[in-house]
């Protein structure tokens, strides 16, 4: 369990550091922040969605979509609408950093509105209604939440 929390903490620290760098460089207030990196044969776009206290990040690369957290219930429709405006129809990877309401509630809305291929989350159960809604929405897509071990590789983009 210690390794999983350590991995999650490292991932959160990396993503938040990236967010701070990009927001500092952009300096433009907006409901969503986008950074793109392009090379001769690939493009990756990272969208930081303003969902209040929580977090939501959309990463797009070569036609694939990764959603990291979804914000709280009050921002669920914003996240769904934003993804639709980005022409998202399928979420290849949905990642829940943890199951607090301000990170997972928006994922429920996305599960109810998009086809999802893979759901990745922390390896524990939380005794809350929003966690149960999340689990039910994952199951409705015929999926289970994956709990990868440190060092597990995934192909994206």
Locations of regions flagged by a protein language model:
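Non-globular, low-confidence helical/coil segments that flank catalytic cores
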Residues: 2-12, 17, 23-157
């Amino acid at each position: 369990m210690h390794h999983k929390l350590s991995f999650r903490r490292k991932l959160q620290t990396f993503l938040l550091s990236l967010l701070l760098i990009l927001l500092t460089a952009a300096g433009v207030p907006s409901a969503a922040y986008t950074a793109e990196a392009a090379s001769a044969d690939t493009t990756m776009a990272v969208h930081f969605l303003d969902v209040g206290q929580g977090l939501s990040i959309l990463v797009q690369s070569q036609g694939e979509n990764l959603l990291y957290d979804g914000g709280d219930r009050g921002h669920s429709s914003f996240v769904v609408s934003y993804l639709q405006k980005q022409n998202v129809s399928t979420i290849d990877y949905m990642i829940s950093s943890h199951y607090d309401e301000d990170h997972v509630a928006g994922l429920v809305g996305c599960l109810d509105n998009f086809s999802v291929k893979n759901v990745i989350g922390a390896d524990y159960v939380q005794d809350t209604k929003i966690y149960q809604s999340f689990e039910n929405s994952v199951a409705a897509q015929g999926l289970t939440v994956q709990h990868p071990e440190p060092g597990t590789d995934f192909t994206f983009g």
